[in-house]
Amino acid sequence: MKKKFLFLITVVALTATSAVAQVKETFDSNSWQWTEYSAELGRAYIIEGVMRLESKSDKANITLDEMVGSVATHSFLPMDPAKGFDLKCTATLEKFEGKKSFGIILDYIDDMNCIVFMIKGDCAWLYKMKEGKIVGQQKNQFKLQKGKKNTSLDIQVVYQGGELEIRVNDVQALLCKYVPITSNGFGFFAFGKCKVDFDDVEILN
């Protein structure tokens, strides 16, 4: 009886472990079919195993949907967001100052329907956009060291039961409750005459 009980525990543990999927994208093969973009405002393209975003515009009074749609890339990830997820990636950017901003896009349906996490100035922002209009937002003071030639960031997004936490270099940038995420669309954007390299996207789902 004892052996049967131990066997059952082992089976349950293995089942629970196998239910968690871990996948990784390094951009070498573009296996997740990321969009690439080139225009006067900038470029989003894969080079040397990273997704590079180059913004050439710092136009004032720009709307969020214009910003997200100008220099951005997205993919539909191999995961079910309803199960919750732990997503990690790295970002390397040149001097972060002035009007420069960058971030990630979650719950992406199209450029006018998504959730945008943005680092700009001394704050981290989260915007919920629907039909091109901001229908919800949250911010938190979050300072990056400015003036360095290159800044390397480890970004982590943890979503579970409607609660969203975003950490940068293991420091909490935002904690948001009651944030429904139903789409597996995910992406990056940059704005304000800057260059950002994204790499090592890893998902635990």
How should these model regions be labeled?
Residues A21-E40:
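Extracellular carbohydrate-recognition regions
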Residues A72-M79, N140-G147, G187:
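Beta-strand-rich interaction surfaces with strong enrichment in secreted/lumenal proteins
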Residues L87-C89, K146-Q160, L164-I166:
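Short tryptophan-centered beta-strand motifs in secreted/extracellular beta-sheet-rich domains
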Residues G132-D154:
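Short, aromatic/His-centered strand-loop micro-motif at the edge of beta-sheets
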Residues D58-K130:
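Secretory/extracellular carbohydrate-interaction modules
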Residues M1-Q22:
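Bacterial Sec-dependent N-terminal signal peptides
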Residues T182-N205:
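Ligand-recognition surfaces built from glycine- and aromatic
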Residues R167-G187:
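Short, solvent-exposed beta-strand-to-loop segments that form ligand-recognition rims
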